[in-house]
Amino acid sequence: LVHGKPMWDTLHVDLPLLPDGDMRHRTVVNKRFGKPSVTDFRLIGSCGGYSWIEAKPKTGRTHQIRVHLAENGFSIVCDPLYSGNQKPLRLSELKRNWHGDEDSEKPLLSRLALHAYKISFTHPKTGECLTLCAPYPKDMEATRKQLAKIFKVDPIEDETE
């Protein structure tokens, strides 16, 4: 889940990445010394000022998905390293006429909104293609349902079945 609405349906990102070496353990784009890093992105759908994005990394660099999205102007919700906005996602920010106590409001999502929903690979001994799926964690599923309810669209409903 990212901030913003991409103007693209698919995006191919080929930017070399290098560990920054700072205390925060960030990764940066470095065209001279970075290692090849490729990610393909697909817009699943948008709800308000948020979008669900599918990422298919072709290489396996540290923070690759996060950096490639941020470099293209789409930071992951609640990302403390690559977003200028790491604050928790709250229902009061989504609903126009929300009536509640902001001091006692619990966040919908207070961690990095990144989830490995599905991974496929070839079994090293049998050669069989294996696909493993992990349902969305409770906080991400609650966020998905709230976004769908408020904006009357659930762009990932068909994706999870």
What do these predicted ranges mean?
Residues L1-E161:
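RNA pseudouridine synthases
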